[in-house]
């Protein structure tokens, strides 16, 4: 396998997590997503529940926000500690074994490696709303809010911790529209690209 590591960044509702999991199964490689939260918690000293709820947040900006945010004795925010633990774990996983890593700025964290395929999966708006209402059993209005909130958190976190813009095609090796291609074809394209 020319590319050992596959990172998948995705819009909420795009099916990126499902696609990544299927690719990992078909290639017989490890799959990392929410299952690394325990490792991040251990390294950062925070609870897994806190990591789960706050992993995509960014440090607050502004003097007032800085003054009232949680920081350690070195001045690092809690969000910075989580990000640093996450970064170190992703670097360790990439050294350890071939794998698929979902989100967590892994594309940026591993940008200096030649054996990484960075994928961004997006989806047409109507299809995204349809998927979210079906998966989460919510009304369309709630689906739109969930989508906007989740993608905003991802974008803000990514843009804060990297020198890049989340979702910008030039940051990725491959950008796929899952509503145009379907899950199966997205999986096939990714697997073809890692050969």
Where are each of the predicted segments found?
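Domain-scale detector for complete catalytic domains at protein termini or as standalone homologs
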Residues: 1-6, 65-75, 83-84, 88-92, ...
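Short beta-strand-centered segment that lines the nucleotide-binding/catalytic pocket of NTP-utilizing
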Residues: 30-41
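Glycine-rich phosphate-binding P-loop
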Residues: 8-21
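Pre-Walker A (Motif I) flank of P-loop NTPase domains
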Residues: 2-11, 97
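RNA pseudouridine synthases
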Residues: 93, 109-112
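Conserved phosphate-donor/acceptor-positioning beta-strand/loop module used by diverse small-molecule
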Residues: 112-134, 140-148
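ATP-dependent small-molecule kinase phosphotransfer cores
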Residues: 41-98
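Small-molecule kinase domains that catalyze NTP-dependent phosphoryl transfer to phosphate-bearing small molecules
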Residues: 59-66, 139-184
């Amino acid at each position: 396998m020319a590319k050992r590591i596959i990172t998948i960044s995705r819009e909420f509702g795009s099916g990126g997590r499902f696609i990544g999991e299927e690719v990992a199964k078909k290639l017989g490689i490890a799959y990392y997503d929410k299952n690394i939260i325990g490792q991040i918690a251990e390294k950062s000293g925070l609870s897994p529940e806190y990591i789960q709820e706050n992993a995509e947040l960014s440090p607050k900006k502004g003097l007032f926000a800085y003054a009232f945010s949680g920081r350690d004795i070195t001045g690092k925010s809690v969000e910075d500690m989580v990000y640093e633990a996450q970064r170190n774990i992703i670097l360790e996983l990439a050294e350890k074994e071939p794998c698929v890593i979902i989100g967590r700025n892994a594309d940026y964290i591993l940008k200096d490696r030649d054996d990484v395929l960075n994928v961004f999966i997006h989806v047409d708006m109507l299809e995204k709303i349809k998927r979210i209402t079906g998966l989460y059993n919510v009304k369309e209005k709630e689906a739109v809010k969930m989508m906007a909130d989740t993608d905003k958190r991802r974008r803000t976190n990514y843009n804060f911790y990297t020198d890049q813009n989340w979702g910008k095609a030039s940051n990725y090796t491959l950008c796929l529209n899952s509503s145009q291609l379907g899950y199966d074809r997205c999986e096939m394209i990714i697997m073809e690209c890692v050969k």
